[in-house]
Amino acid sequence: MASDDRPLALTLGDPSGIGPEIALAAWQLRSERGVPPFQLIGDPEFLEATAYRLGLSVPVAEVEPDDACEVFPRALPVLPLPSGAKVIATPGAPDSANAGAIVESITAAVDLVRSGAASAVVTNPIAKFVLTRVGFAHPGHTEFLAALAAREGREPSLPVMMIWSDTLAVVPVTIHVALRRVPELLTQDLVERTARIVHADLRARFGLEHPRLVLSGLNPHAGESGTMGTEDRDVLAPAVAVLRSEGIDIRGPLPADTLFHERARATYDVALTPTHDQALIPVKTLAFDEGVNVTLGLPFVRTSPDHGTAFDIAGKGLAKPDSLIAALRLAHRLAHRPADTVLPFPARA
């Protein structure tokens, strides 16, 4: 199969959330919104029943990996789970009985990309509490994908989560951890490793020859010379100095409260922040329906919509597919970017 003919591999996500219905809606909008070919890995009968329940005119076709692109114009291609597992789910009622199918879908998507049968992984939202009830040991998608990438003797990768939109791109240095643990986890080494991965992937994946990074402070006023906390002075500033000595264009630590207004955003490509919410609050405020989660540092392309399972609206026909469509389109562009082109970045658009 030629590389340009490979479909995207879309995971099932939590079947009690909005993942299945936004996948159906994305297929419906394939022509209008320029959605690239994708195959969903799950249970064809469940997707068919979901379409019927929502009143969506979406034909579903069970496929083999090589058939997806040919089928995509006329039906939503669904690749059954390798185990043949069936999915039974009620919208808005998460059930740990589906945990095995959720995890299997993610693993199968990665395997398709690693085998060359798919061009990139796009993941539908999962609920961590559903999986942890059955012993899932990873804080989230990002960390699990890093573990999958480390199989077969590969060097474990540091999972780096970038939220990308047409308005702003951000990277939290610490991800799915309690806020009280951030000061102990926020080491100079972690900041340096994260920034190096961001710098390398912006060059390799997006084609930015000279990425511009900025690092926000952890404390108010970036610590104000240690009077409001010492992490900015003792951890973040030394990391920036080392990175700059390596030729990486990075500034900081800068006060987080003045980092995201329009003029400031024009001065950098990606903002790194010490905590999860420092990054996600501004990007979700500015681009709630269009944000895309991109995992950096993996040997394959992975994106996902920048929202959760939305159990409260699942099955009600209220979920918007915009973020999933953006994730599908960006994954396709990243996987098929010609070597001599640069993908548009918010501050350079």
Swiss-Prot record:
Superkingdom of origin: Bacteria
Cofactor note (record): Binds 1 divalent metal cation per subunit. Can use ions such as Zn(2+), Mg(2+) or Co(2+).
Subcellular location: Cytoplasm
Pathway recorded for this protein: Cofactor biosynthesis; pyridoxine 5'-phosphate biosynthesis; pyridoxine 5'-phosphate from D-erythrose 4-phosphate: step 4/5
Entries under InterPro entries matching the protein: PdxA (IPR037510), PdxA_fam (IPR005255)
Cofactor(s) the record lists: Zn(2+); Mg(2+); Co(2+)
GO molecular function, one term: magnesium ion binding
GO-annotated biological processes: pyridoxal phosphate biosynthetic process; pyridoxine biosynthetic process
Task of the protein: Catalyzes the NAD(P)-dependent oxidation of 4-(phosphooxy)-L-threonine (HTP) into 2-amino-3-oxo-4-(phosphooxy)butyric acid which spontaneously decarboxylates to form 3-amino-2-oxopropyl phosphate (AHAP).
Subunit structure: Homodimer.
Protein name, entry field: 4-hydroxythreonine-4-phosphate dehydrogenase
Name of encoding gene: pdxA
